[in-house]
Amino acid sequence: MRLPSFLRRFWSIATSPSSFLSVGFLTLGGFVGGVLFWGGFNTALEATNTEAFCTSCHEMQSNVFEELTRTVHYTNRSGVRAGCPDCHVPHEWTDKIARKMQASKEVWGHLFGTIDTRRKFLDNRLRLAEHEWARLKANDSLECRNCHSEVAMDFTRQTDRAAQIHTQYLIQTEGYTCIDCHKGIAHELPDMRGIDPGWLPPADLRASLPDHGSSFDLEGARAYVAD
């Protein structure tokens, strides 16, 4: 059976456009199409990079976001607020795209109800936290450095403990990064028994710093990371 003439013509144009359309028209069409695609892509990208989008799922709204609202990152004397994307999405475009690709699997978690109840969330909290700590360790706390920079720190305005640790372990020593010490600053910590909390001062500094205890203590952790 022969195709109608208009379908045959459409197929010919689609498979060999240069035979029917001028190079200028094709170039202009490609440019316009590219602009529309790029504009639509970036619009969608920015729409998924907002606090409203992050908290549109009840898993986030009822658990981690509610915890964030009780921290200094959400309400503070300066009025500068860090939202979900500030801490979980890098600002540089290439790093942002890579993070979006990583986060796509979280959509499956939502669809299959991995943490759709408080009980499920608490049961998975340590696993989720360790995954995020490992990610921030691997990228040298890239999202923290969206706002914080050790070269811009005024150590004279920090506590003696914070100034000493920042100077020795961020300025003078390689291999350390923000998340090594500053866990639990925006969300509650999971059960840390048997796990190195990271907030204890390094062994070579403990003798010279105020003692917050040698075992895990939630209030001690909050006091330490607040510095």
From Swiss-Prot:
Q: Mostly located where? A: membrane
Task: Quote the record's binding site residues for heme 3.
Answer: C144, C147, H148
Cytoplasmic side stretches: 1-19
Periplasmic side of membrane: 41-227
- Superkingdom, taxonomy of origin: Bacteria
Q: What does this protein do?
A: Mediates electron flow from quinones to the NapAB complex.
Tell me the protein family, please. Answer: Belongs to the NapC/NirT/NrfH family.
| Gene that produces this protein | napC
- Membrane topology, as annotated: Single-pass membrane protein
Q: What induces it?
A: Nitrate reductase activity can be induced by nitrate and not repressed by ammonium or oxygen.
Q: Where does heme 4 bind?
A: C178, C181, H182
Q: Where does heme 1 bind?
A: C54, C57, M60, E106
Is tRNA processing found in the keyword set?
no
Protein name per its UniProtKB record? Cytochrome c-type protein NapC
Transmembrane region(s): 20-40
Share the record's PTM remark.
Answer: Binds 4 heme groups per subunit.
A GO molecular-function descriptor: heme binding
List, alphabetically, the SUPFAM superfamilies matched: Multiheme cytochromes (SSF48695)
Q: Any idea where this protein resides?
A: Cell inner membrane
Q: Which UniProt keywords apply?
A: Cell inner membrane, Cell membrane, Electron transport, Heme, Iron, Membrane, Metal-binding, Plasmid, Transmembrane, Transmembrane helix, Transport
**Got a GO cellular component term for this one?**
plasma membrane
Q: Which residues form a coiled coil?
A: none
Residues annotated as binding heme 2: C84, C87, H88, H187
Q: Which PANTHER family match?
A: CYTOCHROME C-TYPE PROTEIN (PTHR30333), CYTOCHROME C-TYPE PROTEIN NAPC (PTHR30333:SF1)
The UniProt entry, under PROSITE patterns, shows: MULTIHEME_CYTC
NCBIfam families, per this entry? napC_nirT (TIGR02161)
Name a biological process GO annotation: anaerobic respiration
